[in-house]
Amino acid sequence: MPGGYFQLIAQGPADLYLTGNPSISFFKFVYRRYTPFSMELINLPYNTIPSFTPTQSTEAKCNIDRNGDLLHDCYVIYDLPAIYTADYPFSWVESIGNKIIEETSIKANGQNIDRQFGEFMKVYSDLTLSSTKKEKYDNMINGSNNIIRTAIPTGDDTYPALPSKRLFIPLPFWHCKNSGQSLPLIALQYTQMRFDVIYTRLNDLFTIGNPGVSPEELFNSDNLSQYNQDMRDTLLAEGWDQTNVIFRFARNWDQYSAILANYIYLGEDERTKFAQTSHEYLITQLQRRIYLGLSRGPSRLDLVMNYPVKELIWFFRNQDAYKTNDWFNFTDNQCPDLLNDVKDIRKFIMTKCLQTLIDNDTCDCSGNGLKQKLNLSNQLSDLLSQSYAGLYEGVSVSNMNSSQWDYYSIMKDAKLVFNGHDRFEERLGTYFENQQIYKYHTGKGCRGLYVYSFSLKPERDQPSGTCNMSRIDTQQFFTNIFDTDNNPKENDKFDLHMFGINYNVFRIMGGIGQLVFTN
């Protein structure tokens, strides 16, 4: 008798809890028939062609045409130009696809239904996407470390130092995530749905190097300052104009942008049912509060949020980041991606300053030109004799030590106080940065990103816990910013960006769609 039969015979009372009165079989596949449908991606042009400028944000409006029965996932299309440079290193900012979008909203007959922000889109993708999904997401928005490349001058202007690239930026509105939440355009006969997109000014989207100082040093294109030091006019390119600087590198840029929308077409029976039936959709919305110019030490802030909130997400940013377009550095360290290693400097993105100690000699590679592993070969003089450090695969070097600050969290601790009572006791920043993300999210987040969840499963559409902020009169957030004794930047100022994800109901009745709960 085969041994497998002996296992089946060995049954006891405990097995009744597992196999008594079974309701499923693992050896008979059961499927469900589905209603017929089809899908098609269609480009939606803006009502007027947006004109992107270096110094001002640009707003574009896009009517959602009823090209299909339902509207599912949508994307912002944006064409990055080819970059030509024979003298100045040029680099797009990290996650430029997210940074391009200052904010975007979906409206019904002019009523704002939901509003999203490019910076939140970046951090939320860090929180919710698996490593595989995040890799593809970064490919679409030009966000991963191996895509953010610096255009090293090539000696002529014939061929682009950086090629052009079309970005596909996923919009995170409620109807884009789950097909069961798709927006029923067929039922909105008397409602004009519209996307509004505010694009970031161009000067916030790139950095350029100054060969008069060092090929690796970068400065902000807007105020032409290098790490808070005014640059001399003699170091600037002839005819340099900060209001038009991007067009020195980008040639014949058509500045194309549009909305890519996935329309769903239903079978006749289901189409009729959708058109004649009232609908109520449980949707998610995003709230944002910004607190500017916080000093080191304790702060007490009023949240002023509304509706049932399932999760709070926040980050701090040193105001120095605005001077170097270092938008997604949420730490108190100029080089958060450079880690200490005894033998090898591993892959990193240089943001401002790196000091490497080799046999007690200092090699100061300042700037943002190093985008891959830094190859330090036998002699320090070999590196210093080069105009550019070689961008090669890094190798372990004997007797070499790298010295760098920890990435310095900005927030030391925090707590919530509702109507004068502690919602939870004061907790360290590492609790919000690590434990909360580990327990409630799929992704790993990023350094300096903090989370507090009221929900058991905040990533799912099914609600599993909220805090109704509308019923709490006084909402206070107490936080404490590190004041480290050995930190030379003790007078720095910080901005806090606080986001709350809440639920609301979008009701469609008589061809008109509107929110059920409004302030």
Model-based region annotation:
Residues M1-N519:
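Short, low-complexity Pro/Thr/Gly
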